[in-house]
Amino acid sequence: MAMIRKQDALDYHSTGRKGKIEIALTKPCATQRDLSLAYTPGVAEPCREIYANPEDAYKYTAKGNLVAVVSNGTAVLGLGDIGALAGKPVMEGKGVLFKRFADIDVFDIELDTHDPDEIIRIVKALEPTFGGINLEDIKAPECFYIEEELKKTMKIPVFHDDQHGTVIISGAGLLNALEIVGKKIDHVKVVFSGAGAAGIACAKFYIKLGVKRENLMLVDTKGVVYKGRKEGMNPYKEYFAIDTNARTLADAMKGADVFAGVSVKGVVTKEMVKSMAHDAIIFAMANPDPEITPEDAFDARKDLIMATGRSDYPNQINNVLGFPFLFRGALDVMATAINDEMKLAAAYALSTLAKEDVPDSVLKAYGGVRLKFGRDYIIPKPLDPRVLLWEATAVAKAAMESGVARKPIADLDAYRDSLESRFGRSKQIMRVLIHKAREAPKRIVFPEGQEEKILRASQIILDEEIAMPI
């Protein structure tokens, strides 16, 4: 990854139109008639329809594709409590990712308050405007309370990405890492470093994936979360308190199969890594610098699967693989919530996609680096366009099956095609060609069957059900 200098970042944000986002028109406004339709008197007609049937807001307004990114700036990634205004570039950046990866529109809303009840009151009042709420960079434990209260009363999805985004991606990585090393999820010992929003949520999600609660140990700045501990405790930590003699991270790491870090740089030593079980799995997800660097971890031992939050190392656990596609699926079925079933579906979709052959277009986007399921490739890459198709479809399906979808999708194959069409006419044309090929199958012979490109092309033909091997 190229070095990003301070001035580069400042120039990027200040050159030309300031910031990173704008509002674009979706209807023509070139004539007097256009303006009369867009505003008065024509606008009165959709208003009347929505008054008679509130769900028509999804038909006549942008509500169904609009998400609020809400923050008070109390836990901004790598910067801490910098306040609402200073956190605005991050929230605009979140909007960029929503649009780039899932074609979702965003208004960023920065709230100048530390009062969780005031945040709850304001966000509740915004429900008519948005199809979903993404809570961002709000410190723990207030973030748990805010999300819980909003989910109780709002009829649109509310999602705290700092909690659940990390868990989905790391959960997918965990499933694949365990498969590679041949360990069963209900047998492994897992140690968490960090008991904030991401740490607590990760621990809960790993249990839903199959980790035994008694095999999970939570460690914070005060040490191991054990039964009877008084210092630095809250109800969310109490849930994970266990009977143990371990008191430090070093104690907890002895014999551990998995380390999941969402804490701070450098808390894991080489000696701790050496004390873990064979074929250890280390997810050092602290940003911007991991709990231990891959260089130090592999210097301690070679039988590792290592993931970090950084793009300059293999196996980047990046939230951008989660929230855009999760919301895409949720919005497209008019979901009333993002529930555990949808999050699990997203994790399983990512896990399965990582085992598929990687297209040339993705390889080129990452400089031609070989990407094949294994220790250095346990989760898909963010620029893989298939993530949208796999994850959003899985989420939409889970929403329907779990009863939170207000607008079920009858044909999921057609839905996948519609997702592709969001990102350009060339993909629409390709889908038409694929459909025609399916309707009139031909016998195809590849004389260069030993070539890697031909093998990949053959796999795509098989996946698209254009032809079957003889």
Give the positions of each predicted feature:
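N-terminal ligand-binding/catalytic initiation module
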Residues: 1-158, 353, 397-398, 405, ...
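ADP-ribose/adenylate-binding Rossmann-like module
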Residues: 134-137, 158-161, 258-313
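Terminal amphipathic helices with adjacent charged low-complexity linkers/tails
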Residues: 146, 154, 223, 387-417, ...
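Long, charged amphipathic helices and adjacent flexible linkers at domain junctions
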Residues: 408-436
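A short, aliphatic-rich alpha-helical micro-motif
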Residues: 127, 185, 252-253, 273-276
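Glycine-rich phosphate/diphosphate-binding loop of Rossmann-like nucleotide-binding domains
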Residues: 77, 82-102, 154, 160, ...
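Adenosine-phosphate binding glycine-rich loop
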Residues: 161-162, 181-183, 286-392, 396-402
